[in-house]
């Protein structure tokens, strides 16, 4: 799925610009995403608001803006809907025998986006399939790629000429 961490960061940067007239960098957007990024507007264990400090985009004077997970959930929703659409499309193209395995075992979320508060719950509720966050989501794709490259005989279907 091509929607993920960088798209979320762009959404946060645009949101802070439009909503708060604040200019923030990609690393600041990443910190916001990691601390208060959420896929749901209501969480059982909500993170505390994050104080974001940055320049006013017109005056360059400092701004101190408290940002809540609800606010970030709202600004990320469009891209999360794209993820949901891609999952739906993928499930629709999945052979029935593999589909049964997916329903039985669930789907593992990887990458930085997997760490969004409430993402696994939102997807589980929507698709009625258990979504899990991988043990090490930031490195699991690289580890899986290494495993596949070390065992090309078992994973030949992943290699294109």
Model-assigned labels for residue ranges:
Residues 8, 28, 32, 72, ...:
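General structural feature for long, well-ordered alpha-helical segments within catalytic domains
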Residues 16-24, 36-43, 91-94, 127, ...:
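Conserved NTP-handling cores and scaffolds of large molecular machines
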Residues 1, 108, 112, 134:
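Glycine- and other small-residue-rich loops at beta-strand/loop junctions that grip anionic moieties
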Residues 12, 87, 109, 145:
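Residue-level signature of catalytic and energy-coupling elements of molecular machines
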Residues 75-103, 148-152:
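Phosphate/ATP-binding catalytic cores across multiple sugar-kinase/actin-like superfamilies
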Residues 1-77:
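Phosphate-binding glycine-rich/basic clefts of nucleotide- and phosphate-handling proteins
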Residues 121-147, 155, 159-161:
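Conserved phosphate-binding/catalytic loops in two-lobed NTP-binding clefts
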Residues 41, 99-123:
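Glycine-rich phosphate-binding loops at beta-strand->alpha-helix junctions
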């Amino acid at each position: 799925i091509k929607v993920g961490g960088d798209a979320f960061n762009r959404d946060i940067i645009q949101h802070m610009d439009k909503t708060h007239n604040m200019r923030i960098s990609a690393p600041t957007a990443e910190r916001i995403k990691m601390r208060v990024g959420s896929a749901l507007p209501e969480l059982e264990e909500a993170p505390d608001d994050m104080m974001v400090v940055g320049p006013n985009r017109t005056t360059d004077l400092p701004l101190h803006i408290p940002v809540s997970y609800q606010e970030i959930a709202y600004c990320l929703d469009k891209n999360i809907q794209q993820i949901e659409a891609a999952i739906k499309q993928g499930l629709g193209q999945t052979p029935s025998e593999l589909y049964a395995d997916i329903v039985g075992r669930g789907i593992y979320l990887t990458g930085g986006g997997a760490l969004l508060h409430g993402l696994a719950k939102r997807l589980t509720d929507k698709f009625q399939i258990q979504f899990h966050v991988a043990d090490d989501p930031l490195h699991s794709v690289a580890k899986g790629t290494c495993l596949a490259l070390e065992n090309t005989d078992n994973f030949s279907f992943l290699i294109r000429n």
